[in-house]
Amino acid sequence: AVGYILCAADYRGFVHCYRTTYLRRVLRTAPDQAAGLLGYLWCLGKIKNRPVHFHLDILPPYQRQGWGTRLMDTLCRHLRELGVDYLSCCGVSRDSAGYKMYRKYGFTESYDYGHNTVSLSLRL
């Protein structure tokens, strides 16, 4: 494996599961991690108008070799087939390699959280 891409095409279902299952489990088992997870939930609320959310991670030895673009191409093609109009990711640092890759791919900033962190969206 070179990395992965995860996508929640059902925003409401994802947020519901995040709140009722994942967040509750983490609060019981690792309460010190709750602040970051609650912050993430707040970030998700800022992209409700562009609700298809994803996460991409490429292992360091495979970065800058086109794998991220290939995974994005596959995901975008699949989402278009489902009739999805927008794809979003939240909590991206403007200083990150991911930010540069997403911008090159065509993503635009859709929300500024401050502290050099934004949500990015792509019209499919």
Predicted regions and their residues:
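C-terminal "cap" of GNAT-fold acetyltransferases
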Residues: Y86, C90-Y99, R103-L124
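Feature marks short, surface-exposed loop/turn motifs that line or immediately flank catalytic pockets
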Residues: A9-G13, Y62, D95
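Conserved acetyl-CoA-binding loop-helix of GNAT-fold acetyltransferases
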Residues: H55, R64-H78, K104
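Residue-level recognition of the GNAT/N-acetyltransferase active site
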Residues: H55, L59, V92
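Conserved GNAT acetyl-CoA-binding A-motif
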Residues: N49-V52, L79-G91
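Short acidic/polar capping segments at secondary-structure boundaries
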Residues: P60-Y62, Y111
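Conserved acyl-donor/pantetheine-binding loop and adjacent beta-alpha core of acyl/acetyltransferases
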Residues: L6-L56
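Glycine-rich phosphate/pyrophosphate-binding loop shared by adenosine-nucleotide-utilizing enzymes
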Residues: A1-Y4
